[in-house]
């Protein structure tokens, strides 16, 4: 669901078309598991079987350790005003477990994953990491996302897994960001920690940006110049700092 914006490790989420659906209506007039159904949910125009969850949500069947981590992630997301929604399976294409939309600052997870605590937590970590990527790219107030881990921090098996999942699906441009999120989803507590850093405005200190992302952040005024980046010139390609319409 992303398209390549520049060659520096940033991307934009594709904008879904607005659907003429009455708020609160279910998707009986839309095909189950279709992109139209997904878009209707993302726009919060189809809300039957969809609920927003907060830190006080009770995860039935989760062991305390997993429930605690899930709650920490949701607490941090609440702090930066990113909504987390559980949606009926019919809203999701069959290949999709969850999705984060940086242009709306909300993400959605399939309801049936609640029956699989490990799968749910993994998806929550993964989509939460896309929120961290959003924060890395100048904050969640814009729709850019940037890779968080440096390439040498991501194991080769993770890169191979991302290539298998997304390359074969024709989404090769998304592989760097998806490998980034897959690696985070395999680490206990990492997403919660990074989201808390985002909320506390310490993300760049705790997770130094990649060199090209750092250069872009400074050029666009999202980050103060330092070290070899000073003195610097304002980004000459101002269109790289402004979301495409």
What are these regions (language model features)?
Residues 128-146:
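Catalytic Zn2+-binding segment of zinc metalloproteases
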Residues 107-124:
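Short pre-active-site segment immediately N-terminal to the catalytic Zn-binding motif
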Residues 88-90, 111-113, 135-138:
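A mature extracytoplasmic/lumenal domain signature
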Residues 69-73, 120, 124-128, 177-180, ...:
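Stable alpha-helical elements in mature extracytoplasmic
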Residues 80, 144-245:
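Metalloprotease/metallohydrolase-associated module, dominated by Zn2+-dependent proteases
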Residues 1-4:
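Positively charged n-region of N-terminal signal peptides that target proteins for export
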Residues 22, 32-103:
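Auxiliary, metal-adjacent structural segments of Zn-dependent hydrolase domains
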Residues 7-17:
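Bacterial N-terminal signal peptides
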